[in-house]
Design a protein with these regions (language model features):
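Bulky hydrophobic segments
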Residues: 1-102, 106-129
Length: 129
């Protein structure tokens, strides 16, 4: 691992995004969105967790981590965040835990990881300065 100021910035930015996302998902709500398969709510869940996983992958890349390590920890952290946020929503007024939301989160994470596999050179740090 090669820790650089740029790597620190990426992790700081991604960590801040994760905290913002958790805070936003735990705000009390007056009404619950409808549970449709392709509703705007599900698309927002997918996009939010796609961005979280993507941020983690770039953070690990800037730290000089290998692709297998990048993939593994991006998946573990993203899935942990998604599951934790859904469980906590059960205790927030106007919110509820939803397996549909968690599946949408997982799809977003999966799409980011698919991008890592389809475009590996994009996610690997070049050896030139």
């Amino acid at each position: 691992m090669n820790s650089t100021p740029r790597s620190f910035f990426y992790f700081l930015f991604t960590g801040s995004y994760a905290i913002f996302l958790l805070t936003f998902l735990l705000l009390p709500s007056d009404s619950l969105p409808e549970h449709k398969i392709l509703s705007a709510d599900k698309l927002w869940h997918m996009l939010s967790y796609f961005l979280l996983a993507l941020g983690l992958m770039f953070s690990f890349r800037e730290g000089g981590w290998k692709r297998w390590y990048n993939r593994r920890w991006s998946l573990i952290i993203s899935l942990g965040h998604a599951g934790f946020s859904e469980v906590l929503q059960e205790f927030v007024p106007g919110r509820s835990a939803s397996i549909d939301d968690w599946i949408a989160n997982c799809i977003g994470i999966g799409l980011a990881l698919l991008g890592l596999n389809l475009f590996p050179k994009f996610f690997e740090k070049s050896s030139s300065p």
